[in-house]
Amino acid sequence: MSPSPAERAEDLRRQIAQANRAYHELDAPEIPDVDYDRMVRELEALEREHPELARADSPTQQVGARPSGRFPEVRHAVPMLSLSNAFSDEEVADFVRRIDERLGRRSLRFSAEPKMDGLAISLRYEDGHFVLGATRGDGSTGEDVTANLREIGDIPKRLHGKDWPDVLEVRGEVYMARADFEAYNERARLQGGKVLANPRNAAAGSLRQLDPKISAQRRLSFFAYGTGEVQGGELPDTHSGTLAQLGAWGFPVSELCKVVEGTDGLLGYYRTIGERRDGLPFDIDGVVYKLDDRAGQQAMGFVSRAPRWAIAHKFPAQEQSTTVEAIEIQIGRTGAATPVARLAPVAVAGVIVSNATLHNADQIARLDVRVGDSVIVRRAGDVIPEVVSVILDRRPQGTTPWQMPTRCPVCGSEIVREEGAAAWRCSGELSCPAQRKEAIAHFASRRAMDIDGLGDKYIETLVDAGIVKSVADLYRLSRDTLLHLKLVLDAEEPSALAAALKLHLPAEGSGAVLNAVLKLDGNDPGWRAQALAQPASFEWNTKKIATKWADNLIAAIDASRAATLERVLFALGIEHVGESTAKALAQWFGDLELIRHLPWPLFKRVPDIGGEVARSLGHFFEQQGNQQAIDDLLQVGQVRIADVHAPSAKLREGLDLAQLLVESEIPGITRLRAEKLVAALPGAQAVLDAEHGQFVNAGLPDDTARGLAEWLDADGHGAMLLAAENAMREILAKAPALAEIVAGPLDGQTVVLTGTLAQLTRDAAKERLEALGAKVSGSVSKKTSFVVAGTEAGSKLDKAQSLGVSVWDEDRLLAYLAEHE
């Protein structure tokens, strides 16, 4: 049974009052603007159709919400009213017609300006000095936020110029620019803080901080759009003139403000700003039209909460409410695991949205998004739609908090997150199809396997065609495939490709190939990959196609089969393993077969490799898909590592079970405690077999003993410790004795290169210095042994001189290398 008009009106008043409190007092909107506007318009229609239902305390007769009580109250000398809204061209035409009829004018000029999506404020100046700033509140009474407003650089503390009134109230909008909003949220995500839903919330929440220092840390901005009380002075007789005068007195005024004539001028402005909306540095939710003539404004007057001479023309809503039907994981090109909400389709900003990003697991936890929830989804321009909040009042019973899956939905590898990071990642770098293109491009890059000529477009099409599924497949590429690829990429459409192919196909059997190509849909973005996947035999007409490039690329692929260990390690694309880490791993362990089977704590034996990098290496090599990709690379691709050698003798230093326990980052296990433990329980198996009491008897504090027992019971830890002990024994068996180490002349010294060298490339100089034992760093410090400065050396040279670090020129470096190499 439908509610009566009186019951419906009461329900609408309750919902609108609740929404007003959330929006104006708590700075935490619970429903999208479009839902709010819809309820207000429905209530206005009910009160028009049933005048007996109209009440003085109705939201249709009020502005904003009462002050929160957290700040001193300020009574506005001139009320800060709201604006009526228009949502269609017809409503704008009616607005112009009403003014025309009331004033009897045929040519009406309006000041048009963007409707900022921020917080309305009033600034009071006495004798040119800023003395008071207040929020709108309920239109009559606002909150004193003067201290916070003083932290906004856009707001002048003293008026510029001259001839300002004795008392001047300036009305305007405090907002947060999009770039500042994104920077704030990025910092919050990294620090585990609260991520704000949108720039409007960010501005309002920042301005209502009790500590002005917090407001100062959040970059807020301001635009002036009008005036309130004015005493002891005159303002121009047009609104546009007043804005120009405010600009001369030091207030920011939007450059988008424009004077237009009549309905056509207003609608033209609306469409122009609408087209520019997504590219603006700030959020707007519409435009505002104001009769430019102040005398006309006074003649038009006001209704209860809004002027008759102004109206807001709203854009299509960028936020809507809908339902979460599922939460799935999407794996990006670099392995980032991004949760995506699958939504009941809803129109947002003129586009049907059925998916929205949830950014990361921390964001889901902060919002507490669950399957079945009603949520607010936001879409601004080309930005990916995102879920910004949950409507908790609509949450169905029986929902449960969402948990990040443990396995990649694409390849089944473990999904991992390093300590302190916001993003989770699929650890199947080499084997995950979602990461395939990125992994192959990195593998072939100049500083990795250096396969010159294999560009991104080639890789993309080869992968899409299913010809290259792993890095090992690069070594299966043939000259025919590459020439076929070039024809495919050069063709504008399937018919053009068929014509090009016809020149290189044998007469017998070519018809089937050409017909298959001609059937492809040229409007399908994947048609080229489909064409390349078509099997074909070729008889290349070398007068009609260049072949040298393909021969060169095949030669580059063949040449990459003989590679150094550091290049192969870097080419694998392991998270956190750059060139310098790959070089260090190669120098210290010497053999890919050893490295690929090491438990992660042993990687920490290498200087400058900490827990984060070591765990990343461990996760990578634990994935069966990655191990299979390496096997294929060595067996199918026939990649041969040219510089295999024994592990460094330096690994022997302090390498024992006690150190393994410390490197495993077991809570409370220090070197001294580990030595006591191993003295009582020699061997990893003995430690695994022991119980809490034996750990205490070995000298561990009770809480440390309990923590060790819990750690050993955790999945995989015991097996890892046993494997680490076995790997340690293998290293000790293979590494030469410490006495056999021949120290380089630069062992233990740190060198920095800066500027341009005439006779050496930066890479060549670095390689030769490292061969003599030096560590080549990218930054200068007191620990730097010397700096090699070429021409156009910059700040590094200046810093070296200020710290008293020795500076060598290129001639001295070359002489030293000639003497010691």
Swiss-Prot record:
SUPFAM superfamilies for this protein: BRCT domain, DNA ligase/mRNA capping enzyme, catalytic domain, Nucleic acid-binding proteins, RuvA domain 2-like
Active site: K115
Gene Ontology molecular-function annotations: DNA ligase (NAD+) activity; metal ion binding
Residues that coordinate or bind NAD(+): D33, V34, D35, Y36, D37, S82, L83, E113, R136, E173, K290, K314
Cystine connections: none
Segments forming domain BRCT: 741-821
Domain of life according to the entry: Bacteria
Pfam families named in the record: BRCT, DNA_ligase_aden, DNA_ligase_OB, DNA_ligase_ZBD, HHH_2, HHH_5, Nlig-Ia
Annotated binding of Zn(2+), by residue: C408, C411, C426, C432
Keywords associated with the record: DNA damage, DNA repair, DNA replication, Ligase, Magnesium, Manganese, Metal-binding, NAD, Zinc
DNA damage listed as a keyword: yes
EC annotation from Swiss-Prot or TrEMBL: 6.5.1.2
GO cellular component, one term: cytosol
Family: Belongs to the NAD-dependent DNA ligase family. LigA subfamily.
Function text: DNA ligase that catalyzes the formation of phosphodiester linkages between 5'-phosphoryl and 3'-hydroxyl groups in double-stranded DNA using NAD as a coenzyme and as the energy source for the reaction. It is essential for DNA replication and repair of damaged DNA.
Name of the featured protein: DNA ligase
Organism name: Stenotrophomonas maltophilia (strain K279a)
